[in-house]
Amino acid sequence: MDLSAVRIQEVQNVLHAMQKILECPICLELIKEPVSTQCDHIFCKFCMLKLLNQKKGPSQCPLCKNEITKRSLQGSARFSQLVEELLKIIDAFELDTGMQCANGFSFSKKKNSSSELLNEDASIIQSVGYRNRVKKLQQIESGSATLKDSLSVQLSNLGIVRSMKKNRQTQPQNKSVYIALESDSSEERVNAPDGCSVRDQELFQIAPGGAGDEGKLNSAKKAACDFSEGIRNIEHHQCSDKDLNPTENHATERHPEKCPRISVANVHVEPCGTDARASSLQRGTRSLLFTEDRLDAEKAEFCDRSKQSGAAVSQQSRWADSKETCNGRPVPRTEGKADPNVDSLCGRKQWNHPKSLCPENSGATTDVPWITLNSSIQKVNEWFSRTGEMLTSDNASDRRPASNAEAAVVLEVSNEVDGCFSSSKKIDLVAPDPDNAVMCTSGRDFSKPVENIINDKIFGKTYQRKGSRPHLNHVTEIIGTFTTEPQIIQEQPFTNKLKRKRSTCLHPEDFIKKADLTVVQRISENLNQGTDQMEPNDQAMSITSNGQENRATGNDLQRGRNAHPIESLRKEPAFTAKAKSISNSISDLEVELNVHSSKAPKKNRLRRKSTRCVLPLEPISRNPSPPTCAELQIESCGSSEETKKNNSNQTPAGHIREPQLIEDTEPAADAKKNEPNEHIRKRSASDAFPEEKLMNKAGLLTSCSSPRKPQGPVNPSPERKGIEQLEMCQMPDNNKELGDLVLGGEPSGKPTEPSEESTSVSLVPDTDYDTQNSVSILEANTVRYARTGSVQCMTQFVASENPKELVHGSNNAGSGSECFKHPLRHELNHNQETIEMEDSELDTQYLQNTFQVSKRQSFALFSKLRSPQKDCTLVGARSVPSREPSPKVTSRGEQKERQGQEESEISHVQAVTVTVGLPVPCQEGKPGAVTMCADVSRLCPSSHYRSCENGLNTTDKSGISQNSHFRQSVSPLRSSIKTDNRKTLTEGRFEKHTERGMGNETAVQSTIHTISLNNRGDACLEASSGSVIEVHSTGENVQGQLDRNRGPKVNTVSLLDSTQPGVSKQSAPVSDKYLEIKQESKAVSADFSPCLFSDHLEKPMRSDKTFQVCSETPDDLLDDVEIQENASFGEGGITEKSAIFNGSVLRRESSRSPSPVTHASKSRSLHRGSRKLEFSEESDSTEDEDLPCFQHLLSRVSSTPELTRCSSVVTQRVPEKAKGTQAPRKSSISDCNNEVILGEASQEYQFSEDAKCSGSMFSSQHSAALGSPANALSQDPDFNPPSKQRRHQAENEEAFLSDKELISDHEDMAACLEEASDQEEDSIIPDSVASGYESEANLSEDCSQSDILTTQQRATMKDNLIKLQQEMAQLEAVLEQHGSQPSGHPPCLPADPCALEDLPDPEQNRSGTAILTSKNINENPVSQNPKRACDDKSQPQPPDGLPSGDKESGMRRPSPFKSPLTSSRCSARGHSRSLQNRNSTSQEELLQPAXLEKSCEPHNLTGRSCLPRQDLEGTPYPESGIRLVSSRDPDSESPKVSALVCTAPASTSALKISQGQVAGSCRSPAAGGADTAVVEIVSKIKPEVTSPKERAERDISMVVSGLTPKEVMIVQKFAEKYRLALTDVITEETTHVIIKTDAEFVCERTLKYFLGIAGGKWIVSYSWVIKSIQERKLLSVHEFEVKGDVVTGSNHQGPRRSRESQEKLFEGLQIYCCEPFTNMPKDELERMLQLCGASVVKELPLLTRDTGAHPIVLVQPSAWTEDNDCPDIGQLCKGRLVMWDWVLDSISVYRCRDLDAYLVQNITCGRDGSEPQDSND
């Protein structure tokens, strides 16, 4: 066709635009087999499948980052038709015009005529992002001239590379080819002179080259197409470039001088010969166009390519050719090419010297133009890094050799920027240029086959572009940028320009992942680059090459190093230290890079957060080929990534995924599992903390670095960071043994590094959440320790995930401080992992894996270490100093030494933690260290006893394993700490989750820990091994536990004393109470030392202000359930508790799993439960034990603190029970734990908890008021199987969580309430035992127990429950006979201690005594919990008629708790006995004078006052909605409620408490007959048990008015939770009307509002529901009563007046309602009047004055219409015609308003403005 060039170009532009629209964003080719995603983006089916297959985690749409799945992909036939039609059109166009429009990426195939067109018009190669294509295309179409002018300017700024083609030398052309690379997306277009756009952030002016061979042109075109398709393909294209090289050489030979210089600064326009040449030039220009930025991008891409060694190799040859050409080496081609390259690179004026190929010119012009060019190149590279184009680096390398000839610095920059690319290219270039020789040395060997290249071209590059590239390329880009920047720093102008351009042009969001890599790169490459920059070009190249080599497997050096990856890594990290220039340059560069990273990289990282989605492409980088690893390493900068790569090379454990290599360095399986998680974690963490991302990558470099990295942003001095990084790297080197053992430290071995990396990754979030500031505190001094610790600890943590590694890492972690420092971070990291796992939808699989792997690893490891180290850990944790003197301190001696290191490090870490909130513990020194250890250890897998474990871990990394072991073995001892033990096992996990979720909360917790540690100082030191951490983690809970576990605590103390008298002594000073208990416990048994420790620590916390600090936290924090949960869930959970409500939050989060963290916690709980199961199995737990374990697991699954508390008791008890069976001491400890737990639970409300246990066990049928007693029963392990108890507790906790969340988010609240109430319903459901059992079964399912429990197990549990129910019936009968007979136990704490002391005996009596556990639960809780003890005293347990033996059995109750597992019948009997005893106790307690309660209270007031109320309020509430209701009463209205809640620290009388407890017991389905007996007893003892308030609360019947459906749902959940009745209509039974009000409690008037006032109901604001949910207790309605309405006034107090009034409002009035009325039916109005005492007349004739009543006719004149029959006014006049508003207003204020104002005669019809709003509501 004879078309004008304009028309052709327009058509071509249109075709290109269509191609862009129809191209696959992944492969940048026309979509083949298009498939659409849910986000309506279309991709090639193959591309998407490859993407999906390569992603371990949830894949994300490359464009919008929405998650995609294979299922969501749908074929798009119409789109395929469009593509086919477009191809046909393009084919026709090409046939007609002779121009190639292939895919819109190839330069036009114009023949000479087209080339003439090119000559005539400037070719604008404008790369337009996917989003900007249309605009750019339109702009291109608008006119090439304008673009040409503007582009020329831009190019001058950016630096334009112009190439000359020899073939077209004769054709000087003024025409310029502008390549505008401005797209954010990886997609770019190369607009031929026709307007093909090449995507790049840089505009490059290309002079069309002379005409070349058609083949060359075609190849150039193809290359151009490829290039446009993907700059990554540029490398491949470079192959075509090779073909083009001669052409380019010829072009170079051509005279560029003919071409006017368009570039203002560095823009060089070389006249190009033919159009064909123009296209080839465009290609060549592409190469040239790829400036430093592009080189950087290419570098990254090249790294990707290096991964694809084949492609890299082929590229090498091409690059070599192009480089030779660029360098103007002896090769003519090189010369020709070099000249244009140099010209373009240098932005030379050599246009005039088109044939002057000498590098001299480049040298002359290199400096400024090259810098400018570099900046533009960097810009392009950045863009390419987004696009993952390697061609840029190739071209840049090509130019670079020229520039290298020109300037070593330039070469250095290009080399560093290009890194691997230049290396490979330079390898070829080595021959042509000695300067390049170094680079050649560094150059990688690219052995990747062409097929790989093709794959890379099609997908690898594309994917790498988006996945690896955003990850690697961006990192490379950033690194290159940094590298370039350092180089730029050398070349000052270039630096600034590069920064600006990069920050502006690049959109980091596309490279979110790269942020992480950037960090690593920053560190490693900064080191490398620093070295490079500091060193000569060659040296820099070699070093850079080393880094690059490490990154790129292709590099010879890297291969050498890869051969010895650990050594090379050590050398690499070490080389940073070794290389003087490197270390110096590292600090400098690091500062620089830190600045840059903090600036542009931060932005990029921030943006990249979203771009992290790019990760989906990462799978390519995951290619097992070492080059891929190398590429990743390139991104992460040789040092860390190299190390990783080397490590991965050494350790082939699934390091294929180099980007995730670090993570992969962890156990291969875990690495693979964790990698996606880690990436997710990185993503989430990076998203939250861009710097954190860096740290994650930096963590790859060095876990120390990563901790530091997060600090890096925090670090005031990047220099320091660099130094620290170096130190960290060096530290791992120094700790090579440690590192090697630990997994090779960071540089030492990739095991450490991977673990570090994963640790770092999680660590970064931790630092970000928790210790970022702290880390910065640690930076200078601690960073090393932190590094070492982080490496080691990270290793340990990894080890926890990977037991083998953990053992090695733990043992090898040179310093406990490192471990324990790092464990903190590590746990945080783990939290991040968990969170990210949640984010990545890996939760299910990950959790399962965690169950199977992580759980067992940490569990097995810890269990192994725990038993031997239990004492040591206890002692060591108890006091680091004690470790030295203590014989057990042997391991502790090591621990001590390490802890000495730890302490120094911990000092730093503590400083960090101090920042986090552990300043005092940190300051405390060793105790602080212990505390720190505890905190950190909480973070660590064996976090529960981290303090000790830290000591142990500090002692040796195996210490962690030992700690794991220790946990297992300790669990019997820990049973007292009970939850602690499980916590230890599962706690590590859970803590991690909680800690993650709690990141900031950790600070609070840490603060609490600090305080508690300070208060507990000695106690913590003494009991720190077991309880310090618990105290830490459970700070508040610990205190609660101390109170609760007071009795067991004594036992624990005695065990502790026996085990380590020093510890007991130390703990004794902590608290007198503690000492007393300790002494008692000493008397009782040394076996309970773990419990004692927990109790000690906890008690000191309670008695100390520390607990008050905890108490400052929400009440739930103090809840027994929560406290125990925190204890059981682990210190991590406690941390969460401090920030949130430890237990309750965890419970809520766990149960509701509202947040990833919560979910993680829940998952962790599941894992923990699972572990516990395993543990119980390990403990030779019988099926019964398994059942409790399952129940415990269920409770854990429910993630309920109550579960943890009771369940923990049960589980630990059960496992320990099995162990206890094996070992009486263990069982006694288990009993102690149970007692402690129950005591803790009961402390806050013995009966409530016991009732709750039994209630939940029997169907959790404790109702509102009785809920707490029922809960007490439910919590009685004997009464209720742990699963039920836990379920119920979990449900209650969940309910509280839901309540809490309800408050925070109504929807969430509704969901939470629903969830909680559903679960609670299952557990709390009605008093029918059967329903209880059913609910329990349901709960097990609801609690995700179904995953853990088999159907058979569930059936067995159900059967056991049924048996228990039957036995309870028997118990009921017994209670009826003996219910009123008190057992006469001493009411005082001494009785409890005695009971505790008797516990050992109870062990013997367990089977029998266990039966009495319910009763003992009440007793034990009393004794265990000072507050409860006081209550119990007032109640007195002893008077309960429970003999001391019974009491002991109560103490032993845990064993019955075990026994239910072993023998549900015995448990049932025990329960029945307990119920009987409890009932008796309740009766006697009720009968006990309040004086006893008061007298006892003072003793426990300190502990009780702080914890009890919170616990009582919080725990009772969390434990049950009933308890919540009752707790509201104790707080505001009813002491009996306090009794129920057992919160009555001071106010609630013992009788009331006992009554409440009794009521709870009665209600508890656990005792069907027992309930009856209890009820009878209660009624006999004191009808006050069901006091009017209590009964009123229980009898609350609500209606809602004016609420939205969501709010109604929340109220429903609220009612279900608190066992409140909720009806749709107001009835006589209705007590409360819930109505929406404003802050002043002013409401809209509704029908129910009027009816409620008329009926004397409570008109309560909806805020009451919300506040009660928030407070997790049923608040008094007094404060929420409506004060007014919008019509009659805001404070008329009508509702209150109506309730208090003894007279009817309208008494003596005879009223007739004359219809019509609006908004209110007549019958409702009449009902309203009747409620107010009026005599309603149905018919007007009946209205007479003779009756003596005042006749009134109510009318609504406003409702009269012409259509309606107006009433006969004459007849109406029989009475006073009054507006109905009079009734409404009078009722509102509950005062008769003046009738005169409402007489119809006196007012207009408009008067009825006050009709009720939504009166029908």
Curated annotation (Swiss-Prot):
Enzyme class: transferase
Positions of modified residues (Phosphothreonine): T1351
Motif Nuclear localization signal, chain ranges: 497-503
Bias-annotated ranges (Basic residues): 1161-1170
Acidic residues composition bias: residue spans: 1176-1185
Residue stretches of biased makeup (Polar residues): 308-319, 640-652, 959-976, 1405-1426, 1473-1485
Basic and acidic residues: bias regions: 320-340, 669-679, 891-901
Keyword Lipid metabolism: yes
First-listed, main subcellular location of the protein, grouped into a coarse class: nucleus
Compositional bias of kind Low complexity: 744-760
Chain positions found as Phosphoserine: 114, 393, 686, 706, 717, 975, 1153, 1155, 1181, 1242, 1298, 1304, 1344, 1380, 1414, 1482
Gene3D superfamilies per record: BRCT domain, Zinc/RING finger domain, C3HC4 (zinc finger)
Keyword Repeat annotated: yes
Stretches the record annotates as Disordered: 305-346, 640-720, 735-768, 874-907, 959-982, 1146-1185, 1259-1290, 1375-1486, 1498-1534
Keyword terms of this UniProt record: Acetylation, Activator, Cell cycle, Chromosome, Cytoplasm, DNA damage, DNA recombination, DNA repair, DNA-binding, Fatty acid biosynthesis, Fatty acid metabolism, Isopeptide bond, Lipid biosynthesis, Lipid metabolism, Metal-binding, Nucleus, Phosphoprotein, Repeat, Transcription, Transcription regulation, Transferase, Tumor suppressor, Ubl conjugation, Ubl conjugation pathway, Zinc, Zinc-finger
GO terms under cellular component: BRCA1-A complex; BRCA1-B complex; BRCA1-BARD1 complex; BRCA1-C complex; chromosome; condensed chromosome; condensed nuclear chromosome; cytoplasm
GO process annotations (BP): cellular response to indole-3-methanol; cellular response to ionizing radiation; cellular response to tumor necrosis factor; centrosome cycle; chordate embryonic development; chromosome segregation; DNA damage response; double-strand break repair
Annotated pathway: Protein modification; protein ubiquitination
Location of this chain's protein in the cell: Nucleus; Chromosome; Cytoplasm
Domain comment (free text): The BRCT domains recognize and bind phosphorylated pSXXF motif on proteins. The interaction with the phosphorylated pSXXF motif of ABRAXAS1, recruits BRCA1 at DNA damage sites. The RING-type zinc finger domain interacts with BAP1.
Function: E3 ubiquitin-protein ligase that specifically mediates the formation of 'Lys-6'-linked polyubiquitin chains and plays a central role in DNA repair by facilitating cellular responses to DNA damage. It is unclear whether it also mediates the formation of other types of polyubiquitin chains. The BRCA1-BARD1 heterodimer coordinates a diverse range of cellular pathways such as DNA damage repair, ubiquitination and transcriptional regulation to maintain genomic stability. Regulates centrosomal microtubule nucleation.
Full protein name: Breast cancer type 1 susceptibility protein homolog
Organism from which the protein derives: Rattus norvegicus
